[in-house]
Amino acid sequence: ALGLALAQILQGRSVILVASTDLSHFYPQAVAEKLDAEVLRCVAAFDPQGVLAAEEQGEGFACGRGALAAVLWAAQALGADTVKVLHHATSGDVTGDLTQVVGYGAAVVLRSQIR
C-alpha cells in the first residue's frame, strides 16, 4: 500500500527513490551469505513480495524489508523495469572475523525508457 501511495504522489515527477537496509545480522559468514543471497535474489527479480516472504519463511533477512519492498513496488508502478544488484559484502569481508557478520548489498532500479 505504501509503495503504491508513493507512486501515486510521485507520478509525473522526476524522482529518485532510495531504500536503505542492512541484510543479515550477527550470523556466521556462511549463514549470512545464504540469507543475503535470497533477499538479493528477490531484489534482482524485482519481487517485493518475495523480499517480505523470504524473512517470513526464514530464508532471508533485511531489517528494512518493509521500506525495501515499498520502494520496489513504487518503482514498478512508476515504470521501472530493471533491477541490477551491484555488490554484496559482509562486515567479515572487511574485518576478517567471520563468526558474526552483518550483510550489506547495493542495487539500482532503472526504467529503460524515459517517459
Give the ranges of each region predicted by the language model.
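Flexible, D/E/H-enriched segments
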Residues: 1-16, 26-115
